[in-house]
Amino acid sequence: MAADLVLEIGTEEIPARFLPPALAELAEKGRALLAEYRLAYADLAAYGTPRRLTLYVRDLAGDQAPLVQEIKGPPKKAAFDIDGVPTKAALGFARSQGVAVEDLVTRAVGPVEYVYAVRQETGRPAAEILAELGPRLIGALVFPRPMRWGDQDFRFVRPIRWILCVHGDRVIEFTVAGVRSGPHTWGHRFLSAGRLLVTTAGDYFTLLEENFVIVDPARRREMVWEQVRAAAAAESGTVADDPELLAEVADLLEYPSAFCGCFPESYLELPEPVLVTPMREHQRYFPVRDGTGRLMPFFVGVHNGTAEHLNLIRSGNEKVLRARLADAAFFFREDLEVPLPDRGPELKKVVFQESLGTMHEKVERLTALAGYLSSALGLDETERAQAHRAAVLSKNDLLTSMVYEFPELQGIMGREYALRAGEAPAVAEAIREQYLPAPGGEELPATRAGLVLALADRADNLVGAFGMGVQPTGSQDPYALRRQALGICHLLLDTPAYLDLDDFFREAYAAYGGRLTVEAGEVAAQLADFFGQRLRVLFQDRGLSYGVVEAALAAGHADVRDAWERATAVATFQSHPAFADISTAFTRANNLAKNAAGTRVEPALFKDPVEHTLYQAFLQVREQVEAQIARRRYGAALAALAELREPVDRFFDGVMVMVEEAAVRENRLALLRLVADLFKGIADLSKF
């Protein structure tokens, strides 16, 4: 009989960042194992808190589904003679499958009939299977930094302290890492009554909530957000949406209670990042703002427990935050004693990477790349000067106490200190914008100088790493090279900006001045492949089909924005009534054109009018296509190319390309090569 199943793995405190992927994997592998064991169910979900990972399955079958297997044997004519008497082939096959020969059945496979052995395996009880499945599931979970404890060789995210496993009202027993499963769980570490008996799986959620544990992360997030907003509203304030902080806070606790604390209003004189960073990043508090978005001298924290004694908890948190803000204020005022531009020489003492020199040398490379990009992207004289100045100052804030204590403020504090040193607002903004887009963020540089610096910094990092033979492998990417490549793609796609990355990376390589160990050509090829992989995923994530993406990228992707515009034009072109015929015609031409020795066409060698017709059509269309490509009007270029379909079809209908006469054959191949290459300036339609 179907009944709910609860499997709970009780652990020491799991870091908040590990919880979401652990629950996703628990659900995924739970589904896979239940399918493997043929156990039917209505619904499955994973829940968790810092102290437990829970798989809950609704209406799990009481028995395994029976398995019917049909094993193909010899052809019927070989298994039985004309009188229907089994031959040695039939007898041997039946014996090998453990069935009686009279139980063999026949099945038609096309025009031939074969004999089959039908074997039925009775389903085992779910309790028996779950005792096997439980240890397999727990052992299959993978974590970034698993631990061992005691004398166990078993590894898990944190030490396992208990295992609850109940199917309906039946206890499922097994052992993992020396811990025996049973019908017991534990509530809140400080507020519950101790060990709790789960008599049936359906009691699980209610029992834990009565003991101050909200197992469902989504419900905890809702509770946290409602309480945080209410606490801020009590001080006539609001809290900005912050899904990342909300998720982290919800995964740090089991039973939320929010409170609103305050800090001295004098701290509001400091730049906002100096206040928000200690609150958000270090204390996991929600800053409170007024109706205009300005910070108020309040914060909202969330306590893991009930609302009892909240005044005492609030007071303790206020003391902690005041100490944090006092430190931040001291660092900020200390930093102002040395103007940002005066810190540059000290970068000679800061190592960028051991094999890639100092931060001072990196700044020199960024300055050179800023000059190159200013020309490549068409910056005016004012913007060029701003980009140059921003590059010179770009890393000076790394020497400040604020950035040393709060590394996440790099660039942000550079902007603040640049403004206080009298730098132009665009220069100060560019120093901040060099790190945009931030991981998971959508903000892009608003200044041209910021775009230049953001591109230059990432290119220097990528070329330096690849130039020293360092590339991401599998899940390992210690220098976040994939993220930096995606950052370049987003910058060029969404700003938007046209830039030849091959040329850009050659400039970045040259800026290292012979320091790199991998040859320039090899680095260029590796980076081209690396970016191609990123763009395949990115373009498909933005709604383009696999075929469209492959067709566009096959025509080149050194210019990311240009590749995107070609791809979107091809996607639109797919709706052309004759697209399939055009694609087929191009593919035929392209396949034969691979045999062409060149592209020189001699009209005097034409033997048939269809050759003249195709050549004249090509000349006329080429002029239109090249004019449209020069303006990046790829939709219009494809529309012009569509006019070649009929002449190409007539060409193939009228002549044989691979004739014995070499000169005629090569002339026809060259003509097809011209046609194919014209298409491939936009996309390779043979990829469809």
UniProtKB/Swiss-Prot annotation:
NCBIfam families documented for this protein: glyS
Domain of life: Bacteria
Entry keywords, A to Z: Aminoacyl-tRNA synthetase, ATP-binding, Cytoplasm, Ligase, Nucleotide-binding, Protein biosynthesis
Primary localization: cytoplasm
Pfam family, one: tRNA_synt_2f
HAMAP family: Gly_tRNA_synth_beta
Protein name: Glycine--tRNA ligase beta subunit
Biological process according to GO: arginyl-tRNA aminoacylation; glycyl-tRNA aminoacylation
GO MF term list: arginine-tRNA ligase activity; ATP binding; glycine-tRNA ligase activity
Cytoplasm among keywords: yes
Family to which this protein belongs: Belongs to the class-II aminoacyl-tRNA synthetase family.
KW Acetylation (keyword) present: no
Catalysed transformations (reactions): tRNA(Gly) + glycine + ATP = glycyl-tRNA(Gly) + AMP + diphosphate
Subcellular localization, as worded in the UniProt entry: Cytoplasm
Subunit structure: Tetramer of two alpha and two beta subunits.
Enzyme Commission numbers on file: 6.1.1.14
SUPFAM superfamilies, sorted: HD-domain/PDEase-like (SSF109604)
Transmembrane domains' residue ranges: none
